[in-house]
Amino acid sequence: MLKIGSHVSMSGKKMLLAASEEAVSYGATTFMIYTGAPQNTRRKPIEELNIEAGRKHMELNGIEEIIVHAPYIINLGNTTKPETFQLGVDFLRMEIERTSALGVAKQIVLHPGAHVGAGADAGIQQIIKGLNEVLTPEQTVNIALETMAGKGTECGRSFEEIAKIIDGVKYNEKLSVCFDTCHTHDAGYDLVNDFDGVLNEFDKIVGINRLQVLHINDSKNVRGAGKDRHENIGFGHIGYKALHHIVHHPQLTHVPKILETPYVGEDKKDKKPPYKLEIEMLKNGTFDEGILEKIKAQ
């Protein structure tokens, strides 16, 4: 079974149940959530996440595994503000606890961090320090380090940087990787003409067994732009053919594929989620040039 889904919202009183219902309405077989707002520290208590009802709904609809994304405010790479670094450590610990309580997620996707001007080496050492403070041999969920585009002072823009972080962490069996197609393309990897070569390079440097999550996004920018701007499937510089190849790649069948493509529409208040039709299009193997109009008409 193809494990494909998108980012969905866990909100209101229904929480996990609402997220599962949204995912099922898109024809998804997995999904990704934040356990609260990605840009702040406000979090509902675990008891209010409606876990039991959410899990029951998932089970009825054949969804076995989901992904959690850590909030953006975590920056383990910050060497200049100890309070920012400490917030990241404390908050990541809490996210591990919340994700464990869900019982259906094995991976927490984390942007490794930004060095905010101290240089990549200093940032990477700080990220290693943070992960060494957070990870324990007992934890049941992994931290999936996301491949980054290289925007600003982001660390993790190359497979070598990801490998350097992993190598420095004591309990690194608790680390995996989330491979983001837009980010790796924007960082300079040639997914369009040589994805197999890129995957082999990843295997040599990091190890393909660590690749546990895929973010499937097209890119608004040319390869190597270092920008990180997602585009709808088939309308960017990666294109439908390459993304379809990645989604159905025989070495990645077990890996959950998560779409984070932009909502569609000119009216900011009435943008439509593209996921139902994009998932359908990635399943059926044919690019639909009129898909954006169909999404708007939903």
UniProtKB/Swiss-Prot annotation:
Transmembrane segments: none annotated. Binds 3 Zn(2+) ions. SMART domains: AP2Ec (SM00518). Belongs to the AP endonuclease 2 family. SUPFAM superfamilies: Xylose isomerase-like. It is an enzyme of class 3 (hydrolase). It comes from Bacillus mycoides (strain KBAB4) (Bacillus weihenstephanensis). This is Probable endonuclease 4. GO terms for molecular function: deoxyribonuclease IV (phage-T4-induced) activity; DNA binding; DNA-(apurinic or apyrimidinic site) endonuclease activity; phosphoric diester hydrolase activity; zinc ion binding. Zn(2+) 2 binds at E146, D180, H215, E260. Endonuclease IV plays a role in DNA repair. It cleaves phosphodiester bonds at apurinic or apyrimidinic (AP) sites, generating a 3'-hydroxyl group and a 5'-terminal sugar phosphate. Keywords: DNA damage, DNA repair, Endonuclease, Hydrolase, Metal-binding, Nuclease, Zinc. Its cofactor is Zn(2+). Pfam families: AP_endonuc_2. Zn(2+) 1 binds at H69, H111, E146. It comes from the Bacteria. It catalyses: Endonucleolytic cleavage to 5'-phosphooligonucleotide end-products. Its EC number is 3.1.21.2. PROSITE patterns: AP_NUCLEASE_F2_1, AP_NUCLEASE_F2_2, AP_NUCLEASE_F2_3, AP_NUCLEASE_F2_4. Zn(2+) 3 binds at H183, D228, H230. GO terms for biological process: base-excision repair.
